[in-house]
Amino acid sequence: MKKLPVCDISYIQVRFLPIYLHQIIEKVNTKNQIIMKPEHLTVDTFKEKVFNYEASKDWKFEGDKPAIIDFYADWCGPCKIVAPILEELQEEYGDKLNIYKVDTEDQRELGAVFGIQSIPSLLFIPQEGQPQMAMGALPKETFKQAISEVLNVN
């Protein structure tokens, strides 16, 4: 059995640690507060956290707080305008709401389920009631208005 130097083992541990932490938090500010960023969803995490469309055709939100889902693509110019706004909103509202992102190029099934034909498309999901879809690069004030009026989050 070949012995590995301790530094090689720690390299392996450190190498994979940021990948895991990236899924939970993105950065820490100067006051050592955790700053959350929008979470990227796959088909499986979507079914778990938002709506299991295979189990039921009737809308049943699986989340524990209101959410916004950004259906986007990396090559989309307007999507690149919306991305930093959503990051600011996630930081501003913290754990009062969840902001998720769905890459329509990687998660084509989710785009098809919601009939996404233009991006960005944004799904506003209140804790109770039906979700509402908006399309296009919305300004921050419009997001804040929808968060207040549709999601009932202040």
Question: What residue spans do the PLM features occupy?
Answer:
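Non-catalytic, surface beta->alpha helical segment in thiol-disulfide oxidoreductase systems
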Residues: 118, 123-154
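N-proximal helix/coil linker or "cap" segments that precede and/or mark the start of modular domains
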Residues: 28-44
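Short hydrophobic targeting helices and cationic amphipathic motifs
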Residues: 17, 21-23, 33
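A short beta-strand-turn-helix
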Residues: 41-67
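Short pre-active-site segment immediately N-terminal to redox-active cysteine/selenocysteine motifs
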Residues: 64-67, 71-75, 118
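Thiol-based oxidoreductase modules, predominantly thioredoxin-like and allied folds used
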Residues: 40, 71, 83-90, 94-109
